[in-house]
Amino acid sequence: MSDLISYDDVIDAAYDIFLEMAPDNLEPADVILFTAQFEDRGAAELVETGDDWVEHVGFDIDKEVYAEVRIGLVNEENDVLDDVFARMLISRDPEHKFCHMLWKRD
């Protein structure tokens, strides 16, 4: 296996992919909200990889190779990312690029 990409690079890649795909996968109001408030409240956070990903992708997840990133808006009162616009599973292996996103649905 090749060297895994850093968690910082995973977050950057996830955010770039999110920005590219958000207009096609989120409600227009959510895109406007995220764009308007990202400067003050936006976040892309690495979180513990959820055990539910196998249900979404159909294969077992090696938590050393795959990382989960959540992208959304932080609640200013408690500094918690509680308005999640997307969850992304992304491979850290540069030889086997993969990502799968779960989008916010109203």
From Swiss-Prot:
Role description: May act as a double-stranded DNA (dsDNA) mimic. Probably regulates the activity of a dsDNA-binding protein.
Top-level taxon: Bacteria
SUPFAM superfamilies named among the record's database cross-references: Putative dsDNA mimic
Gene3D superfamilies reported for this sequence: dsDNA mimic, putative
Lineage of the species this protein comes from: Bacteria, Pseudomonadati, Pseudomonadota, Gammaproteobacteria, Vibrionales
Xref: InterPro entries: dsDNA_mimic_put, Put_dsDNA_mimic_sf
Name used for this protein in its record: Putative double-stranded DNA mimic protein VIBHAR_02752
Family recorded in the similarity comment: Belongs to the putative dsDNA mimic protein family.
Listed Pfam families: DUF440
